[in-house]
């Protein structure tokens, strides 16, 4: 004899699906839906194509220490610089309604400054010419000055962001080479390599921790200051913001300075990874990936409302996609084409109009299902 269901059991069975439907509808409308959906698609694809993609194992670093290895670790590690840049690029985009296309060249400059401070005029120094902290501070100051230069052109001279940053985009790598007299110094100090690789005894790459630290810092700044509110206000309507006592020019300027600081951190990691940099190719096209991360996060490239968490997820989506393509032996020369097709689809799906239509379609399907169940 079949067990008789009580009214409470029937109520619970009806309530649970309704809660799931409500959550799903809310998620579809949320800005963070697209990067989460993209990550899930990539995860499912790799699970079907090759489940070993998610294997994490212990291996030995070059110094003989046990470290974690696997594609997931590679994604977290290699995405670190992009995540840091995506944070700054989100603020710049929200405030100015434009993007900074010079971050790749600025990374080359900041890395060149690190090499100059630590190596001096010696291309193969046996010992560092200055403490590492001094090199990092010098790198930050120079990168923030270049950020201030871009910010001044945009905020005070009213030049379009892409045109203003095109100056440094064009000249930046030549400046980086000039700083070290067209030489490529190599840093042999083991401790300096900790920042871009592994710290002995810690099996997770150091850049992962640096990226997390940057996320925590920007989250605290957003929570305990009005920077986020002012940035959003200026991006939505600069004139109204001025009437409310906000200085739009200063807010735009400060976001470029913050992006400069993010560039400095990314440049420092780049140099630490390889003990040197090639000025002409280091961080090449990373500005495009940073802009795509912002777009994939559902942020309007015309400025206004923004979500840094969504941009960070967008950065991880891009790196996940890149690693997946390499995993399946896609030629590096063909990688941009594959990447562009997938990114175009994701960007179209992240458009507010498309998201609204998806939400309506989801709602209709759920209502139809509910009506069918009722019958």
What are these regions (language model features)?
Residues 263, 278-340:
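Transmembrane alpha-helical segments in multi-pass inner-membrane proteins
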Residues 46-47, 68-121, 154-159, 294, ...:
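Single transmembrane alpha-helix segments in multi-pass membrane proteins
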Residues 131, 137, 145-146, 203-278:
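Helix-loop-helix "hairpin" substructures at the membrane interface of multi-pass membrane proteins
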Residues 123-169, 314:
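Alpha-helical transmembrane segments within multi-pass membrane transporters and channels
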Residues 34-48, 89, 139-143, 169-174, ...:
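Hydrophobic core segments of alpha-helical transmembrane domains in multi-pass membrane transport
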Residues 157, 161-224, 251-254, 273-283, ...:
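Transmembrane helix-bundle core of multi-pass membrane transporters
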Residues 1-48, 55, 236-239, 243-250, ...:
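Cytosolic-side transmembrane-helix boundaries in multi-pass membrane proteins
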Residues 55-57, 63-74, 179, 228, ...:
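Inter-helical junctions in multi-pass inner-membrane proteins, predominant
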């Amino acid at each position: 004899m079949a067990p008789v269901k009580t009214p409470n059991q029937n109520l619970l069975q009806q309530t649970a699906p309704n809660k799931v439907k409500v959550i799903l509808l809310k998620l579809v409308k949320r800005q963070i839906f697209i990067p989460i959906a993209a990550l899930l698609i990539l995860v499912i694809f790799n699970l079907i194509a090759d489940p070993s993609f998610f294997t994490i194992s212990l291996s030995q670093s070059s110094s003989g220490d046990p470290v974690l290895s696997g594609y997931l670790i590679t994604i977290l590690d290699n995405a670190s610089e992009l995540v840091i840049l995506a944070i700054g690029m989100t603020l710049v985009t929200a405030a100015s309604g434009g993007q900074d296309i010079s971050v790749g060249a600025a990374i080359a400059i900041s890395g060149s400054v690190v090499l100059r401070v630590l190596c001096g005029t010696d291309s193969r120094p046996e010992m560092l010419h200055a403490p590492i902290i001094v090199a990092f501070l010098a790198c930050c100051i120079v990168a923030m000055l270049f950020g201030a230069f871009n910010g001044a052109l945009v905020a005070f001279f009213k030049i379009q962001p892409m045109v203003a940053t095109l100056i440094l985009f064009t000249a930046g790598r030549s400046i980086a080479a000039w700083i070290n007299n067209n030489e490529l110094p190599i840093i042999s100090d083991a401790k300096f390599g900790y920042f871009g690789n592994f710290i002995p005894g810690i099996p997770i790459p150091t850049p992962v921790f640096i990226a997390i630290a940057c996320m925590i810092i920007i989250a605290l700044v957003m929570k305990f200051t009005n920077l986020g509110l002012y940035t959003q206000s200026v991006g939505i309507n600069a004139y109204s913001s001025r009437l409310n006592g906000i200085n739009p020019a200063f807010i735009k300027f400060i976001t470029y300075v913050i992006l400069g600081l993010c560039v400095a951190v990314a440049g420092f990691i780049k140099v630490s990874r390889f003990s040197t940099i090639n000025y002409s190719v280091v961080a090449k096209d990373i500005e495009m990936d940073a802009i795509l991360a912002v777009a994939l996060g559902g942020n309007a490239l015309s400025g206004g409302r923004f979500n840094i968490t969504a941009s960070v997820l967008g950065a991880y989506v891009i790196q996940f996609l890149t690693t997946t393509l390499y995993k399946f032996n896609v030629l590096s020369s063909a990688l941009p084409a594959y990447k562009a097709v997938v990114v175009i689809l994701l960007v179209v799906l992240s458009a507010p109009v498309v998201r609204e239509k998806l939400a309506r379609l989801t709602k209709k399907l759920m209502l139809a299902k509910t009506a069918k169940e009722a019958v």
